């Protein structure tokens, strides 16, 4: 019988190891071809992560300098393209702040209702996509069923499923269509039970819990220092939501809770989004019940298109108004402004400098995904390589918003 001996090295000689650089993306299922992470590995541990961005850069901020304020709305659709009504709203509020105007109350209710539908749509996707990135595909198939219902509602209102471009400075493009309220009430009746389905699928799933609980922890102090916002901030125990703390539109008339958790890990960030969908449903139901009659757009010929489109065909004044706004846009007083909303990913803000012309002199977008992505620096120290996908997925960045 052959004697088994232990392999050994001379006493005092260290094991020869070296750090490895690994490219995660851009050709990787979790980064969708638009994000490259250069990982510095010590064995299976991630010592450092260096995000390389810009694969989806389209020059949104520079393009805005050549567009009228109305023409910029389609550009905002393509920031967080999962939730375009929120992007439209943030930009519209910034311009209205410069003009010193407010949209009619009915328009504000419509805007808020659409923004909350967009929030649910965005949260639904990450509710199913995070488990899918970790190997559990079933949840994604469930959430896409409800997300399709939201797409149908948005298409019913705007005529488009994704790039809605529905907001306008001073209101919205048109009023809600006939038959909309029965459709959205049907969704409101169905959706709470569907959320419970997602929870039953995942909240007791040991594999999902082991891959997310205690992984990628961000403390409250680090979250504030990094400038995180949205669910990524609230999952670390920081109770901050612009809708409640700096209310805009009609949020101060609505009753809803701000969801927070203390763990700060991947599971807490996932759980915050699931619970926020319930609060968004409460907001939508209140908007339906409180929806007032009235105009959907401000009645200012120098800013808004004619409320009655038929007047364009029989009134010279209305035709001139329509032509001027379409061809040349409206002038905004000189000044600068910053306005932010609580978008699904966090604080989405627009900083605009006006020189008094129909086009902005400078526009800066404060994109929450851009800020949230830097949290990768703080949560990956001494974590396994296999955890990187869970950490990235739980931060829920949209690269179109990062690269602009």
Curated annotation (Swiss-Prot):
**What keywords does the record list, in alphabetical order?**
Cell inner membrane, Cell membrane, Membrane, NAD, Quinone, Translocase, Transport, Ubiquinone
NCBIfam families in the cross-refs: NuoD, PRK06075.1
Entry membrane topology: Peripheral membrane protein
Which organism does this sequence originate in?
A: Rhizobium etli (strain ATCC 51251 / DSM 11541 / JCM 21823 / NBRC 15573 / CFN 42)
State the function annotated in the UniProt record.
NDH-1 shuttles electrons from NADH, via FMN and iron-sulfur (Fe-S) centers, to quinones in the respiratory chain. The immediate electron acceptor for the enzyme in this species is believed to be ubiquinone. Couples the redox reaction to proton translocation (for every two electrons transferred, four hydrogen ions are translocated across the cytoplasmic membrane), and thus conserves the redox energy in a proton gradient.
- Top enzyme category: translocase
What reaction(s) does this enzyme catalyze? a quinone + NADH + 5 H(+)(in) = a quinol + NAD(+) + 4 H(+)(out)
Q: Where in the cell is it found?
A: Cell inner membrane
Q: What is this protein called?
A: NADH-quinone oxidoreductase subunit D 2
Q: Principal localization?
A: membrane
Q: Which GO terms describe its cellular component?
A: plasma membrane
Pfam families in alphabetical order = Complex1_49kDa
**Family the entry assigns:** Belongs to the complex I 49 kDa subunit family.
Quaternary assembly: NDH-1 is composed of 14 different subunits. Subunits NuoB, C, D, E, F, and G constitute the peripheral sector of the complex.
Q: Record keywords: NAD included?
A: yes
Q: Which SUPFAM superfamilies match?
A: HydB/Nqo4-like (SSF56762)
List the Gene Ontology MF annotations in alphabetical order. Answer: NAD binding; NADH:ubiquinone reductase (non-electrogenic) activity; quinone binding
| This enzyme's EC code(s) | 7.1.1.-
């Amino acid at each position: 019988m052959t004697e088994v001996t232990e392999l050994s090295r001379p006493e005092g000689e260290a094991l020869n190891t070296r750090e490895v650089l690994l490219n995660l993306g851009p050709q990787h299922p979790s980064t969708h071809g638009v994000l490259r992470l250069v990982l510095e590995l010590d064995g299976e541990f991630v010592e450092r992560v260096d995000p390389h961005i810009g694969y989806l850069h389209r020059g949104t901020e520079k393009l805005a300098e050549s567009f009228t304020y109305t023409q910029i709305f389609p550009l905002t659709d393509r920031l967080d393209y999962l939730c375009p009504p929120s992007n439209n709203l943030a930009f519209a509020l910034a311009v209205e702040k410069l003009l010193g105007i407010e949209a009619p109350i009915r328009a504000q209710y419509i805007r808020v209702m659409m923004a909350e539908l967009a929030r649910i749509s965005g949260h639904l996707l990450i509710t199913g996509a995070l488990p899918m990135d970790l190997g559990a595909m079933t949840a994604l198939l469930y959430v896409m069923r409800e997300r399709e219902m939201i797409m149908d509602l948005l298409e019913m209102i705007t005529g488009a499923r994704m790039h809605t471009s529905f907001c306008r400075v001073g209101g919205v493009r048109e009023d809600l269509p006939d038959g909309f309220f029965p459709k959205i009430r049907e969704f409101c009746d169905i959706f709470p039970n569907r959320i419970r389905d997602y929870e039953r699928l995942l909240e007791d799933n040991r594999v999902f819990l082991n891959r997310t609980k205690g992984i990628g922890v961000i403390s409250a102090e680090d979250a504030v220092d990094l400038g995180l916002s949205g669910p990524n901030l609230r999952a670390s125990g920081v109770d901050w939501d612009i809708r409640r703390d700096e209310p805009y539109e009609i949020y101060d008339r609505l009753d809803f809770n701000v969801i927070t958790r203390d763990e700060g890990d991947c599971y807490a960030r996932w759980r915050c989004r699931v619970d926020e969908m319930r609060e968004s449903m409460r907001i939508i139901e209140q908007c339906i019940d409180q929806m007032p009659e009235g105009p959907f757009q401000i009645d200012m010929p120098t800013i808004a298109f004619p409320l009655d489109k038929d007047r364009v065909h029989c009134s010279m004044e209305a035709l001139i108004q329509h032509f001027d706004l379409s061809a040349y846009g409206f002038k905004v007083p000189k000044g600068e402004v910053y306005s932010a909303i609580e978008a699904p990913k966090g604080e989405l803000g627009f900083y605009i400098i006006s020189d008094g012309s129909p086009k902005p002199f400078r526009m800066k977008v404060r994109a929450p995904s851009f800020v949230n992505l830097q949290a990768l620096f703080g949560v990956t120290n001494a974590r396994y390589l296999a955890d990187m996908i869970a950490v990235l997925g739980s931060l829920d960045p949209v690269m179109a918003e990062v690269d602009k």
